[in-house]
């Protein structure tokens, strides 16, 4: 049997997600238990959203949790480069191979033509997918368009009838009708590969034997199986893990739960407790004990113990487990050491001090001015907003609209946050000063604070959004009747 090789392949397009850490953990545990290797690959084909800063945050966050990898962009390895953007034109070569073999085709439709196609399908109650119109072009017509420099994508061919059989380690046999599968774009008009082509090519070239990923990829499995068949390659074993869920059983999302690993790091959770909790997501130790280390998980790991019921990511349960780790594993000396590392982290502290120093006269003043930087959720009440110069409904609506705008913000920097909030105040016809005042209360607990936009940038997106969410709830968010009206008003802004 060949060496077991698993991988995690995050996209560096935002904060490191707990879902990424969850899948990485199970990939690493499986590989280590089987005496194999765990690989990290960066899927940065989305050049408009991928950033080096996000990549660094992902690597740092996974390392903070105690995860490490045998090969990756930072440690190298025999099958690199481990960033897709650095792998040159290999994807174009493989896409061309599929064209030459008759398994893929050029498609020349404009965005407008594709939109019109989908709208017509929607009106007729048909599945919205590519209808294969470019397959009707003759070889001469295709060549003429290529010679004329008409922009194109390369799509894969899909069988018109029959069923794809997917074998899954946890779920057994899954059958998916080919009629449900789209003729996937493999190479985009800019020459960059889509996830589906790059993922299959890289997994093959990096000798990945087991693909352990979230169950949201089940419907994509037929495309991947077909690509392996088209290339004549051995298919890795598939394993689709259950998705993490909110306590209300909905898919884990930042609107209902903090999803960034950085949030839990900044909130003062122990990395051992967070990885322990992620290990309990759908899996259990043979003796059913709740508290265990990463090494203990790997020692006893059996992927068949994964339960397919949606595991609930409950922050209260995580806090309880973290408390157990603190009480059972830390002496006063080690607690003091970890607390100082967290609270007086030089990198974090140096961001705060330039805001604090102009506002203090003694060291003892620092706690009053900067205490909110070292807290989780603030104990604010409705009375804390009593000095705000806005009508109650306007205040409630302004805070809800601000939260929605912040949830949609992809670049979390001071100037971006300020510009978004200022623009929102203008379209809502509220003076910026009056609009910003409740933001101060939500973020710092008082209207007399250091710059709220500096504070939000330093605290990070998840803590800032969570505090805003708390403020919206304290003020009384929209009722069911108001919610639809507010959403329409917000969409019309």
Curated annotation (Swiss-Prot):
> Under which EC number(s) is this enzyme classified?
6.1.1.17
Recorded catalytic activity of this chain's protein: tRNA(Glu) + L-glutamate + ATP = L-glutamyl-tRNA(Glu) + AMP + diphosphate
Pfam families (alphabetical): Anticodon_2 (PF19269), tRNA-synt_1c (PF00749)
Q: Which NCBIfam families match?
A: gltX_bact (TIGR00464)
The job of this chain, per UniProt, is described as:
Catalyzes the attachment of glutamate to tRNA(Glu) in a two-step reaction: glutamate is first activated by ATP to form Glu-AMP and then transferred to the acceptor end of tRNA(Glu).
Q: Which family does it belong to?
A: Belongs to the class-I aminoacyl-tRNA synthetase family. Glutamate--tRNA ligase type 1 subfamily.
The subunit field of the Swiss-Prot or TrEMBL record says: Monomer.
**Protein name, please?**
Glutamate--tRNA ligase
Q: Name the species this protein comes from.
A: Marinomonas sp. (strain MWYL1)
Taxonomically, what lineage is the organism?
Bacteria, Pseudomonadati, Pseudomonadota, Gammaproteobacteria, Oceanospirillales
The encoding gene: gltX
């Amino acid at each position: 049997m060949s060496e077991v090789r698993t991988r995690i392949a995050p996209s560096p397009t935002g904060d490191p997600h707990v879902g990424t850490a969850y899948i990485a953990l199970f990939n690493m545990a499986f590989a280590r238990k089987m005496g194999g290797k765990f690989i990290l690959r960066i899927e940065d084909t989305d050049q408009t959203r991928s950033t080096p800063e996000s990549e660094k945050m992902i690597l740092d966050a996974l390392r903070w949790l105690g995860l490490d990898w045998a090969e990756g962009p930072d440690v190298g390895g025999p099958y690199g480069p481990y960033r897709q953007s650095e792998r040159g034109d290999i994807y174009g070569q493989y896409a061309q191979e599929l064209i030459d073999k008759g398994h893929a085709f050029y498609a020349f439709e404009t965005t407008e033509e594709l939109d019109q196609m989908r709208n017509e399908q929607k009106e007729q109650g048909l599945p919205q997918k590519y209808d294969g119109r470019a397959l009707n072009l003759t070889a001469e017509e295709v060549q003429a368009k290529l010679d004329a420099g008409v922009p194109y994508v390369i799509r894969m061919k899909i069988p018109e009838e029959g069923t794809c059989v997917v074998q899954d380690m946890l779920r057994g046999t899954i059958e998916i009708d080919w009629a449900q599968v789209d003729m996937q774009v493999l190479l985009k008009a800019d020459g960059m590969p889509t996830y589906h082509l790059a993922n299959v090519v890289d997994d093959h070239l990096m000798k990945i034997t087991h693909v352990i990923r979230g169950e949201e990829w089940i419907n994509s499995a037929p495309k991947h199986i077909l690509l392996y068949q088209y290339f004549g390659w051995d298919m890795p074993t598939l394993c689709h893990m259950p998705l993490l869920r909110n306590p209300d059983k909905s898919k884990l999302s930042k609107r209902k739960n903090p999803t960034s690993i950085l949030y839990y790091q900044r909130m003062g959770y122990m990395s051992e407790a967070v990885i322990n909790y992620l290990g309990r997501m759908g899996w259990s130790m043979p003796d059913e004990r709740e508290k265990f280390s990463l090494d203990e998980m790997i020692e006893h790991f059996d992927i068949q113990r994964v339960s397919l019921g949606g595991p609930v990511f409950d922050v209260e349960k995580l806090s309880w487990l973290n408390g157990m780790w603190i009480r059972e594993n830390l002496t006063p000396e080690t607690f003091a050491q970890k607390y100082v590392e967290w609270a007086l982290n030089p990198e974090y502290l140096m961001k705060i001090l330039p805001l604090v120093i102009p506002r203090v006269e003694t060291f003892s003043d620092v706690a009053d001015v900067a205490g909110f930087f070292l807290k989780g959720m603030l104990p604010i009440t409705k009375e804390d907003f009593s000095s705000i110069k806005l009508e109650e409904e306007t205040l409630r609506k302004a805070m809800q609209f601000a939260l929605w705008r912040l949830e949609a913000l992809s670049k979390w920097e001071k100037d971006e946050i300020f510009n978004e909030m200022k623009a929102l105040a203008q379209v809502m016809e509220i003076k910026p000063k009056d609009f910003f005042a409740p933001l101060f209360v939500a973020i710092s607990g008082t209207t007399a604070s250091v710059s709220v936009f500096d504070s939000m940038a330093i605290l990070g997106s998840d803590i800032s959004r969570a505090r805003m969410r708390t403020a919206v709830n304290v003020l009384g968010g929209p009722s069911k009747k108001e919610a639809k009206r507010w959403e329409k008003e917000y969409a019309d802004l």
